[in-house]
């Protein structure tokens, strides 16, 4: 009698790793850790620097990066160039501008013109880019009424004093509107590294 043909053995699939579930778990953990550090390491570093500076007896003046258009905030140790006439409604435009400094909103005033000067430093909606776009104003929440802000514009210094600080929704765009009197309005995303809220600081001009 002819023998029955043997069934071919099914090939076993082997994985290069003993347990793919563990590997995937480690990858997810690593990604989560990277995002966490990207979001919170820079703010934590800035906070530590601020606390050390607050307890230090030395009070060194801050040097503006230029005298053409820049900002100095002594209380939080912030200095930055200001990029003029940036469209605040086009994320591609303002995120590019924010890699160079604080953005001045297109259509708002300039120092000495008697209108609302609107400056902003957004966080990115992209978690991996968040710290790039908000570092200048990370510590803005420490500002209180009476703190001073200096703007340099066309080789002239302008001094402003904080009069108000507010936490608003991202849809609150009324602070971009012109005023009949000169006002300096600063805006950043809050908490740092997110786009959940907007922190607004308002200041009025005083003599320099």
Q: Where do the model's predicted regions map?
A:
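N-terminal Lys/Arg-rich, disordered targeting/topogenic segments
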Residues: 1-18
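Solvent-exposed, non-transmembrane regions of membrane-associated and secreted proteins
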Residues: 16-19, 25-156, 160-208
